[in-house]
């Protein structure tokens, strides 16, 4: 999933140059990602792409099958190969969600240790999600509500975001469901101005 990663700095979006120093089969364990625009570099250590932030070494608690099914349904992950981002405590369900939906999942700032698989990758970041614009089908922000604004950039038009019921969304989202735990919104995509010709 390295091809989806982008420099989190504020400049024109571009791919990152990757140099790997240690791999296990197809999994990158150690290496560096470099930005060709601003020359920033980001380490890959222990299989985690580190753009800032940290990842806990604690083991993930068991997530109930009902909770995984609920997240999959709220994110509308019906197509195998869809891309979902699970943030913070939501990332505990990354492996189970990937198995259930056959989706690719990025565990962003997980609250516990997540093992990478063919469809699950771990990324640590601070205030900007280091993914390509309009590349994600769904994102569950959990306790990473500060990333809601940037979620609008990475979601495809019609992509869904699930957040705690206390969250508020910028105008780039349209709320579609709410219960006592969560609120679900849909990305409306970029607005295109229409001009009449004279």
Locate the predicted segments by residue.
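N-terminal auxiliary segments of SAM/dcSAM-dependent transferases
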Residues: 1-66, 75-76, 198
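A generic alpha-to-beta junction signature in SAM-dependent methyltransferases
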Residues: 78, 101, 153-156
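Class I SAM-dependent methyltransferase SAM/SAH-binding core
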Residues: 80-131
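A short glycine-rich, Lys/Arg-flanked "PGG" loop and its adjoining helix->strand segment in the class I
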Residues: 145-170
